[in-house]
Structures are given as structure tokens and as C-alpha cells.
């Protein structure tokens, strides 16, 4: 039997294997045992611990059988203890008679008191499993159709298994914890409540004024923040009273609104002054056509300017394709920061505004525009920049000539007007400056003299496109190294100026 086990299990050790060996009495009965010592050499003797607490050595030549192997090749003697399965449960029986011809064994089950007849293949010399000693299993009824698996399933009934928690519930708890944490750290919880009684309009105006430089008339240089005296446009939503920036100590002081304010608000003293804008570099596009020098802000506008004003539109569009790329260049212009507005009291604004005319050139002509009741037609703000601002759109060549409204010999503003219709009074400015004087002076002062820039030069003397000499035409494409830098970069030729 040991050789059969070794063939079945390969090179695995036989230690601990359950075997059946003859008893020491020599009556031929096989009893259940377990291998304790294996023979070191093939064909040697191995020791086994048998029932009754004694050990026996037996050779590895088949004198012992596996406890779970069929007993067809062995003879069972009367009174020998065997194990059978009856109604899904294992019972111990005693052999009464072993019939080798029919291969049947007559048994007597002591626990049930029954005489049974079973096939030899259904009889085992050792029990398959230990009997269950738990009271739960003893109380469970056994049905005739039950199998051995029912006993195994009933084992899991006595194990307390906790209920499974879904991942969604755990995620909801995590989200709830995060929400509570964020609420505990919010400014509404941390900041103290405002207990002082403050007029609502005053508080709202103070909140709106935060963050911007306010001019005399109420308009702000920072978009989105307005002063109390400005009610023309829709302001940005004010901050809440629970914001950490505004505490009860700030709102404890009461103020009286007198129209013009000369002193800043108390809560602005602790905050840093608004940062001044540094000199920024603005990229412009300059027309390289002789005696033109037009400056525009977009490349589309300068291309359209060159194409419409200098090259002209005609039928030979294939020859003029992308020709406007040679007649403009990119320049960088420094933009000076705006001068900060200086607050001025009503008493100091009594002097009338004097508009000094600029000496007109011979080609200029004066245009008298009807007085329009708008902030642009009265006066300019004192917060105007100290340098010349050239304000015009990319398509200014399609609009009217730029109109100059001089304020002083050194400070004036050029404003281009978009041609909305043929009549001048219906023109709308592209950009305007807000007023900084009282309404009485705005009604009294009107613009009487507006000097216009010279009209566009006539296109009668300009050369037809294609007649001007270029490095590309003089030297040819094959001698590109002899071209000027402007021609290499597809700009207007600087070597052959016509």
C-alpha cells in the first residue's frame, strides 16, 4: 500500500498519512493508524501509530493499506469496526458477514440498531470526519435526501458575519466630513458678528469703494468698484458683512456722506496702496509705405490699411496676393502709466476751464460740432495722462479723421470717431474720459473750437502696384542673399525707395 501511495503522491512524504495495519494479536483485522516514521530507503520498515496507543513497524511492500482506499482486496472479519454513510451521516458499524462472491458486507449499526447490507466499496476502515459536537448541529433535523454538504453548510450558520457596508455609504460619510470641515473653516464662522448699528446705504457704499482709485466725479479707474456718488452704472456685488477683511472694529466708526470725500475710508489705511502700473510695452504695426507711417494695433487692420489705401483693389487679385506683407513692420511702443487722480474740493473747482486752441495747419479745416449733452462735450478729467494718448481702432482708416480736443499746450487727447452714419451729431466715441467737475460747470462750458487733423492724401499720384522696384525684382529669387533685411522679412523694400 505504501508503494501505491508513493506512486499516487509522487515524491511526497508519507508522514502523517492515515493507514490501516494488522493488529498485534495476529487475528487479521485491520485497524486505523497514522504513519509516524517513514523508511529512509526503499523497501525498508516504517513505524505507524495505531489505535490503542501502540506503535508497530511494517514493511513498505504493501502490508498496510490506506485508510480511505477501497477494501475490495482485504477480508473483513466478524466484529471488525467499519464506517458507513447512512442518510447523509456517518455511522460506526460492526461487520457480521463478508461475502466475497457478491462483494457485500452485512453490518450492524449500534447507534441506529439496524442491520444493513452494503457494498464493499461503500465500507471504510476509518472515519472521514470527526463527529460534530456542537448543540446546534445536534438539534438540526436530517432529511432523507440530505447530503454531506448540508452539514458543511450548516457550519456557516453559527458564524457571526457582519453586514457588508456599501462603498456608497462610506463615500457619503467622507463627503459629509469634508463639508463639515469646510464649514468650520469658513469666514462666517471665524469672523465675529457685526453688532454695531450702521446705516445700510453707507456700509454698502464703503464696501463698493474698496479696491479702486476714485476720481472727483465718482468714476473709478479700477473696473468693478464705484464710489457712492456714482449711480450711473451697475456696480459689482459688495462683500458680505462676515468677510474677514471687515471686522466690528472697522464698522464701529460712523461717517457722514457729504458728497465729495477728501479723506480715505478708515479701513483703507491699514491696507497697502493700490499698485501702480509699470511702463508697459505695447506692440504696434507701422505702415512702411512712403510718407504714411500709419500705426495700428492689430495685424489684420494694418494689412487691410495697406491693401485698401496703397495697393488698391482690382481684377488682378492673383498677382497682388499677400503683397501687403511687404509694407508693414512691427514696432514696440512704451506706454506711460496714468497719473493718479488728485482729489479736489468743490471750492477749488470754481475756476472755469479754459480751452486753448492749437494753431491750425494750412491743410486743416475746422469742423463745428453741435453741443451734445454728454460727458465728452464738456471737459476732460483731471486724471488724464501726462503724455499723448493715441486712441483709435484698428479700422480707423475707414472712419473720419481723428479730432483733437486740446486742454493745455502739453496735455491733449486724440479721439477717433467711428462713422456710424453720414451725419456728425450721431457719431459715437470709441473711448471717452469721464468728467471731474461739478454739474454747474458742465452745463456752462461747451466746446466751441474743434480742430481736425488733415484729410487723407489723395491717391492720384501714387504708383500702380508692381511698378516699384524691390530687391526681389532687381536681384531675383535666386540671389536672396543680396536682398535687404526688409525684403527678406517680406516687408517694404528699404533699399529702393520711390
Swiss-Prot record:
A motif (Nuclear export signal) lies at residues 171-180. A zinc finger (C2H2-type) spans 285-310. Residues 214-231 have a biased composition (Low complexity). SMART domains: c-clamp. GO terms for molecular function: DNA-binding transcription factor activity; RNA polymerase II cis-regulatory region sequence-specific DNA binding; zinc ion binding. One of its GO terms (cellular component) is cytoplasm. Residues 130-157 have a biased composition (Polar residues). Keywords: Cytoplasm, DNA-binding, Metal-binding, Nucleus, Transcription, Transcription regulation, Zinc, Zinc-finger. This is Zinc finger protein 395. It comes from Xenopus laevis (African clawed frog). The lineage of its organism: Eukaryota, Metazoa, Chordata, Craniata, Vertebrata. The gene is znf395.
